[in-house]
Amino acid sequence: MTFEPRRICRELNAHGVRYVLVGGFAAALHGSPLPTDDVDIVPARDADNLDRLGAALTALGARIRTGGEPVQTRIDGAFLAAMPFMLNLTTPFGDLDLTFRPA
């Protein structure tokens, strides 16, 4: 897997997903020299946005990241709405962490 964070963000943007970029990649865009190996976002929680996010994740080939093999499942708006806090995903372009209720 090659880490292509801009490819992940382009797909989210192409689907009209409203989100805030946070974490290490956001810091790198602001000049931080610290390395990062994932993209962290906080998506807007309205149903339409979660539907668009689900479509973007499908287009990215996102799977649920686990301690072992990633789990393939249907990730749609209803699935995302049921997530209480966080969802860790992997894509062919790198890992993507969704935070639904940031601290």
Where in the sequence are the language-model features?
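Compositionally biased terminal segments of proteins
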Residues: M1-A103
